[in-house]
From Swiss-Prot:
InterPro entries: Alpha-defensin, Alpha-defensin_N. The keyword Phosphoprotein does not apply. This is Theta defensin subunit A. There is a cross-link at residue 73 (Cyclopeptide (Cys-Arg) (interchain with R-65 in subunit D)). Forms a cyclic peptide with subunit B (BTD-1), subunit A (BTD-3), subunit C (BTD-4), or subunit D (BTD-7). An additional intersubunit disulfide bond is formed. There is a cross-link at residue 65 (Cyclopeptide (Arg-Cys) (interchain with C-73 in subunit D)). PANTHER family: ALPHA-DEFENSIN 1, DEMIDEFENSIN-3. Residues 25-45 are annotated as: Disordered. It comes from Papio anubis (Olive baboon). There is a cross-link at residue 73 (Cyclopeptide (Cys-Arg) (interchain with R-65 in subunit B)).
Length: 76
């Protein structure tokens, strides 16, 4: 009976350890997705409005350019 209890306890510990490793792997993966990697930092999007845009632009807004990088946008 004592052997059965020890085997059951060991099996339970192994199962809990495997479950903890799986949770840690998921947490590490989620943290890696949230942090911008080296390849993401160089990515930027740029938008320009042509002179014949569908919406009429004021004289000061013609040729206005928006550059968006990860986290913020700025007008040029």
């Amino acid at each position: 009976m004592r052997t059965f209890a020890l085997l059951t306890a060991m099996l339970l510990l192994v199962a809990l350890h495997a479950q903890a490793e799986a949770r840690q792997a998921r947490a590490d993966e989620a943290a890696a997705q949230q942090q911008p990697g080296a390849d993401d930092q160089g990515m930027a999007h740029s938008f320009t409005w042509p002179e014949n845009a569908a919406l009429p632009l004021s004289e000061s807004a013609k040729g206005l350019r928006c550059v968006c990088t990860r986290g913020f946008c700025r007008l040029l």
